[in-house]
Amino acid sequence: MNVYERTQQRLKTVFDLFDNIYVSFSGGKDSGVLLNLCIDYIRQHGLQRRIGVFHMDYEIQYRDTLDYVNRTLAANADILDVYRVCIPFKVQTCTSMFQQYWRPWDGSMRDIWVREMPEGSLTQHDFPFFTDEMWDYEFQNRFAEWLHRRSGAKRTCCLIGIRTQESFNRWRTIYSDRNHYRCLLYTSPSPRDL
């Protein structure tokens, strides 16, 4: 069985078991392939359902990546529920000797934003759990819980595209024996059927 066939098997399992599915989509190669596989799966199998797309918009991004994200979301609006978040969470930085983190979409720095916030974006006011001390990765985890409650789903699945060849830590995350669901490996457990 080749990688594509194995992916189709895994997607069938995901779509059979979870009533709420969303893809974490950065606009990069890995998440782009995964999102397009999901879109194709829905269309090829005639599924009458939508999937969520969680896009953390970091304000500063390559123009081609922004164009790709916008094009992909617009072309598939009929089956995608888009959660494009523009949040001033803390983000690690190695470009400053004076700051350990920076904040995209920081309202107090609006006059130097790199670009305008995209129309229809979700902001910190849409998330009651957001605090100024929150880091981007903490926000991701809290978003999953928020979306699960908001959707009223029985089971929520977040799909993340990862190439393990890029990092030993990524490889360890994927090939860990700690987390199983119906004989399938997954990266991290969450409470309440997430």
Task: Describe the residue ranges of each PLM region.
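ATP-dependent adenylation/nucleotidyltransferase module used to activate substrates
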Residues: 1-188
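A short, hydrophobic C-terminal helix/tail in secreted or cell-surface proteins
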Residues: 189-194
